[in-house]
Amino acid sequence: MDGIWIEVSVITKSEALEPISGIFYGLNCPNVAIEDPEDLLSRDQGPLTWDFADINILEHKGNAAVVKAYFSQDDKVEEIVEYVKEKLSEIKEFGIDIGEGTVEAKKMHEEDWANNWKQYYKPVKITDKIVVKPIWEEYEKNDEELIIELDPGMAFGTGTHETTRMCIQALDKYVKPDTTVFDVGCGSGILAIAAAKLGAKHVVGVDLDPVAVDSSKENISFNNLNNIEVLEGNLLDVVDGKADIVVANIIAEIICVLTEDVKKALNEGGLFITSGIIHDRVDMVTEKFAECGFEVIEINKDGEWNCIVAKAIN
C-alpha cells in the first residue's frame, strides 16, 4: 500500500454492522474496520472484554457505530459511494435498522490508514476457553485457553459482533471430539477455526465468495490446523457426506432458504446453529425449522440479535 487511500465510512447502528461490512467485502475490499461503542458499553471494563481499545469510539454522536473501508485512490470512489447507498436501501428493506446511514468519503495517507484500523482490534475473550487475537497482538494465554489467530482485515468475522460471539459460544457447548462441523458462509473462517480448536474431528467451511474462501484459508494457516477444508460454492453442491453440526451466521431470510438443504446435510439428531437473526425474524426462522423437521432447543439473545440452535428430529 503506497501513497493516498480513500476511506469510505458508513455511520450506522450496531445491528447493521454485519450486513454493511458485507457490502464492502462484496466489493473485494479486504480492508474494513468496525467501530462499535455499544460493544464497549455492554461489557464489563477490562482489557479482554473490549474488542476496541480506543476509548474515543464512545465519542460518536448518539453512540453510533461506524464501518470504514479503505480503497485505492485509483478506485472509482463516487461509484462506490452510490453503490453503498443503494445496498443500504436494500438492507433497510430486510427490516434492519441502519440508523443514520450516512456515507462519507475522505482521503487518508497510508500511515494514517494503517494506524487507524489496526488500533481498534485487541484480544477478546469469547468464552472461558476461546480467545480471539489479531495476528499482530501479543497475548499470554493460560493453560485452559484456546487462541484463535485472526487477521480481521480479510473477511467478516472477527469476534466483535454479537452474532459471531453467540455462534462460538454454542460451538463451545456442543462440539465433541468426534464431531463433524459444516460452516456455511464461513467468511473469515473464525467459526470453522473455533470448531477445530474445540476438538471437532473434521470441519468444512463453505462460502460463495472467493475472497472469503481465500481469507478463511489464510486464517486457518495462521492457526496451524490441518483438519479444516474450505470450499467455494453452495452447501450441497460442494460438500460430500454429512455433519453433526451445521453453523450459519447469516441473515434470517437466507437461513430459511438453506434449511431444507441443511436438513439433508445433517446426521439424525444433528444440530443447526444459526445467528444473524434480528428479534422480529425469530418466528419466521422457528416456523421454517418446524416445517423442515427441526426442534428448537435453544434461543439466545445478545443485543438486537438471536442465536437459534435446532435439532434434526425426523
Curated annotation (Swiss-Prot):
Chain sites annotated for binding S-adenosyl-L-methionine: 164, 185, 207, 249
Domain of life of the native organism: Bacteria
EC number: 2.1.1.-
Protease is among the record's keywords: no
Keywords recorded for this protein, A-Z: Cytoplasm, Methyltransferase, S-adenosyl-L-methionine, Transferase
Reaction(s) the record says it catalyses: L-lysyl-[protein] + 3 S-adenosyl-L-methionine = N(6),N(6),N(6)-trimethyl-L-lysyl-[protein] + 3 S-adenosyl-L-homocysteine + 3 H(+)
One example of a Gene Ontology biological process annotation: methylation
PANTHER family attached to this UniProt entry: ELECTRON TRANSFER FLAVOPROTEIN BETA SUBUNIT LYSINE METHYLTRANSFERASE (PTHR43648:SF1)
Family statement drawn from the similarity comment of this UniProt entry: Belongs to the methyltransferase superfamily. PrmA family.
Protein name: Ribosomal protein L11 methyltransferase
Organism: Clostridium beijerinckii (strain ATCC 51743 / NCIMB 8052) (Clostridium acetobutylicum)
